[in-house]
From Swiss-Prot:
PTM sites of type Phosphoserine: 46, 49
Effect of residue 231 to C: Decreases glycine amidinotransferase activity
Gene, per the UniProt record: GATM
Lineage: Eukaryota, Metazoa, Chordata, Craniata, Vertebrata
Domains as described in the record: One chain folds into a compact single domain composed of repeating units, five beta-beta-alpha-beta modules, which surround the central active site.
Tissue expression notes: Expressed in brain, heart, kidney, liver, lung, salivary gland and skeletal muscle tissue, with the highest expression in kidney. Biallelically expressed in placenta and fetal tissues.
Location of N6-acetyllysine modifications: 385
EC number, as in UniProt: 2.1.4.1
Catalytic activity: L-arginine + glycine = guanidinoacetate + L-ornithine; 4-aminobutanoate + L-arginine = 4-guanidinobutanoate + L-ornithine; beta-alanine + L-arginine = 3-guanidinopropanoate + L-ornithine; taurine + L-arginine = taurocyamine + L-ornithine
Name of the molecule in the record: Glycine amidinotransferase, mitochondrial
Organism: Homo sapiens (Human)
Effect of residue 234 to G: Decreases glycine amidinotransferase activity
Binding-site residues for arginine, renumbered to this chain: 170, 305, 322, 354-355
């Protein structure tokens, strides 16, 4: 058994968060929500370059290995996840709140063990093909290190086995020349960052900024142990009140709950991202970037990119089943709101951690090229009508692990500059 000793209340990260208090209730939630409604615009600063004080690590801005401001500039380098050794997470309260009831027996039986061998083998092959196609399109591909996620670990607050390194979008976000490691909210993902450390250290040595958000203890207080699981109606009511399975005990967030459009970054409060986590990001990125909270009619939000996926300057795919409550913000800014067609993934295909709407979880290679599932003909036709070339890849078995093309990747470098698309 892998045992890890850590200081209670400690933080693995380069940024400190003020201690808010041991009892966080409605007052804090309301304050945080009001705080987030808008942030002040600011002029560009040294974030836009890769310059560092140490001459040995001071490349010219054009040489920085990390540079990405949005979801659609020409893609030059990307991290693609791995399905190898992926494990079913233990069936804890935070996992239960983020999965469909029909799969609960699967988690109860298989938690702590590898996902079905044949399924993983197919998923590995699909992602290898995806990597080959990206390389053919001129994109540099990096992969996380293989890790055995079945190893048990223990902290002073919990013990668990791991999950996978399949979804770099969940743990990493690039903002300009900085790569940020998210703290995550599932106990099974506590050590997921280890798979990416060799890549990130390489970027750091070559001049990129590297930040790790404060690591949560993931103590019992972070989770609402009485969160109603069965009632969708109750979940709708609680979501409208900003209450989820994660509490405001300490900051937590998944990077996939943020989506970028130049100076403006949009975030949702979800089952894995709390208001304190978003506040940490807002303070950390200010004044160069503005972080806005948006919300959706979604009883079980987890990750924004299969609900609200920005595919170009002022162009967004908006999930018709999960309408955005703040859509007028984008309409007033002149954005084009596109409703993607209903996905056609079969009902009997296992989706252990996600919904069928992974069909809209696409990866833009640039404004005129998109990587889309080879089986999803309706959305292919939609893109073609928009004048966007579709690069068709089959990742149906990889979908079962909880992500589409956007989830399976983290765009490290796109050829572009910092701009504002909301003013």
């Amino acid at each position: 058994m892998l045992r890890v000793r850590c200081l209670r209340g400690g933080s693995r990260g380069a940024e400190a968060v003020h201690y808010i208090g041991s009892r966080l209730g409605r007052t804090l939630t309301g304050w945080v929500q009001r705080t987030f409604q808008s942030t002040q615009a600011a002029t560009a600063s040294s974030r836009n370059s890769c310059a560092a004080d140490d001459k040995a690590t001071e490349p010219l801005p054009k040489d920085c290995p990390v540079s990405s401001y949005n979801e659609w500039d020409p893609l030059e380098e990307v991290i693609v996840g791995r399905a190898e050794n992926a494990c079913v997470p233990p069936f804890t309260i935070e996992v239960k709140a983020n999965t469909y009831e029909k799969y609960w027996p699967f988690y109860q039986k298989q938690g702590g063990h590898y996902f079905p061998k044949d399924h993983l083998k197919k998923a590995v092959a699909e992602i290898e093909e995806m990597c080959n196609i990206l390389k053919t399109e001129g994109v540099t591909v990096r992969r996380p290190d293989p890790i055995d996620w079945s190893l048990k670990y223990k902290t002073p607050d919990f013990e668990s086995t791991g999950l996978y390194s399949a979804m770099p979008r969940d743990i990493l976000i690039v903002v300009g020349n900085e790569i940020i490691e998210a703290p995550m909210a599932w106990r099974s993902r506590f050590f997921e960052y280890r798979a990416y450390r060799s890549i990130i250290k390489d970027y750091f040595h070559r001049g990129a900024k590297w930040t790790t958000a404060p690591k949560p203890t993931m103590a019992d207080e972070l989770y609402n142990q009485d969160y109603p699981i069965h009632s969708v109606e109750d979940r709708h009511k609680l979501a409208a009140q900003g209450k989820f399975v994660t509490t405001e005990f300490e900051p937590c967030f998944d990077a996939a709950d943020f989506i970028r459009a130049g100076r403006d970054i949009f975030a949702q409060r979800s089952q894995v991202t709390n208001y304190l986590g978003i506040e940490w990001m807002r303070r950390h990125l200010a004044p160069d970037y503005r972080v806005h909270i948006i919300s959706f009619k979604d009883p079980n939000p987890m990750h924004i990119d299969a609900t609200f996926n920005i595919i170009g300057p002022g162009i967004v795919l908006s999930n018709p089943d999960r309408p955005c409550h703040q859509i007028d913000l984008f309409k007033k800014a002149g954005w084009t709101i596109i409703t993607p067609p209903t996905p056609i993934i079969p009902d009997d295909h296992p989706l252990w951690m996600s919904s069928k709407w992974l069909s809209m979880n696409v990866l833009m290679l640039d404004e005129k090229r998109v990587m889309v599932d080879a089986n999803e003909v309706p959305i292919q036709k939609m893109f073609e009508k928009l004048g966007i070339t579709t690069i068709k890849v089959n990742i149906r078995n990889a979908n079962s692990l909880g992500g589409g093309f956007h989830c399976w990747t983290c765009d490290v470098r796109r050829r572009g500059t910092l701009q504002s698309y909301l003013d």
